[in-house]
Regions:
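Conserved Nudix-box catalytic region and its N-terminal flanking loop in Nudix hydrolases
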Residues: 17-56
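Active-site-adjacent beta-strand/loop module that shapes the phosphate/pyrophosphate-binding cleft
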Residues: 61-62, 70-94, 104-108, 120, ...
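A SAM-dependent methyltransferase catalytic signature shared across enzymes that methylate proteins
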Residues: 55-65
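Short secondary-structure boundary/capping segments
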Residues: 10-11, 25, 71-72, 93-97
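Conserved N-terminal beta-strand and adjoining loop/helix that marks the start
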Residues: 1-18, 39
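A generic structural signal for short hydrophobic patches within well-formed alpha-helices
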Residues: 111-112, 124
């Protein structure tokens, strides 16, 4: 049995707003929205991976907070784990740098106004209960 490979996602929060990122690649995911993040590299902690991915994908410096309970299956052998995160003081505002073409800060009332990737829906439900 193959060990799961962890993909980390960020519930990047600003007050009661959640950052959503619209995929531009690959073509089968383009136009759908997700929590920003990426794969944990060998020897890297999940928290360090998430901070690195936010720097690479959005150009921000963020503090990783608590893990959202749950683990969501992606395409095998990947699983999604989500952490809260907040921008550090002095961090630039997020920009869509890699694999994204738009970003939106969503209020609790707007969370379901975007078409989320299927694998992110349950995580967003968990996050919604915390906003």
């Amino acid at each position: 049995m193959t060990e799961p490979i962890v993909v980390v996602g960020a519930a990047l929060l600003d007050a009661d707003h959640l950052l959503a990122a619209r995929r531009s690649a690959p073509p089968e995911l383009a136009g759908r929205w997700e929590l920003p993040g990426g794969k944990v590299e060998p020897g890297e902690t999940s928290e360090a991976a998430l901070a690195r991915e936010l720097r690479e994908e959005l150009g921000v410096e963020a503090e990783v907070g608590e893990r959202i309970p749950g683990e969501w299956p992606l395409k095998p052998p990947y699983v999604l784990q989500v952490w809260t995160a907040r921008l550090l003081p002095g961090s630039p505002q997020p920009k869509p740098l890699q694999d994204h073409d738009d970003l939106r800060w969503l209020t609790p009332a707007e969370l379901w106004d975007v078409p989320w990737l299927d694998q992110d829906v349950e995580a967003v439900r968990e996050i919604a209960g915390r906003l």
